[in-house]
Amino acid sequence: VESINNAIFDNGCENKSKHGDAMEVKIKHPDLVYIDPPYYSPLSDNEYVRRYHFVEGLARDWKGVEIQENTITKKFKSYPTPFSTRKGAADAFDKLFKKFSNSILIVSYSSNSQPTQDEMVALMSKYKEHVEVVPIDYTYSFGNQKHAKTNRNKVQEYLFVGFNGEDVWKKK
């Protein structure tokens, strides 16, 4: 808690944040856009809505949510998204990157998902002069316990940071 509290500072500006479906959010010229989309993987059922149901339930105010009582983690019923297929995910990222081409972009995405790291960099590079990838080692804590000894729970979470210009952090 102390380290989190120490990270809070006053930049002297009036700041606003929005949350919601990045495809639908209406905001003019955001400085920074953070996107943590559902991950598509043909090898896993780690579908965002089904796995992160508590956060999703809160975001939906528990409206229209159907819980699968027979699952250990009480997953949600699957809801289709643009990220439900490989092509759909690539197209959705392209649309998001284009929509926010004038903003700093930070995208969180898993190494075991598709599009791949190289494909994500290529997509973001269509709209950003600079794309950096920050890999963070991560271990799934639940859901793949049958494979705990095979390292299938170990992945990298990538933070893709895209921006234009040389000194993006000092523009104001």
What are these regions (language model features)?
Residues M23-E24, Y39-Y40, N112-Q114, T139, ...:
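Short, solvent-exposed loop/turn segments at secondary-structure junctions
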Residues E14, P30, N102-I104, H130:
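A general structural motif
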Residues I27-P30, L43-R51, T116-V121, N144-K146:
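A short acidic (Asp/Glu
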Residues V1-Y48, D61-K75, Y79:
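SAM-dependent nucleic-acid methyltransferase catalytic core
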Residues Q117-V121, K128-K171:
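Class I S-adenosyl-L-methionine
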Residues S78-K128, P135:
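Conserved Class I SAM-dependent methyltransferase catalytic core
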Residues F54-L96:
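Glycine-rich S-adenosyl-L-methionine
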Residues L43, V49-W62, P82, Y127-E129, ...:
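Accessory, usually C-terminal, subdomains that scaffold auxiliary metal cofactors
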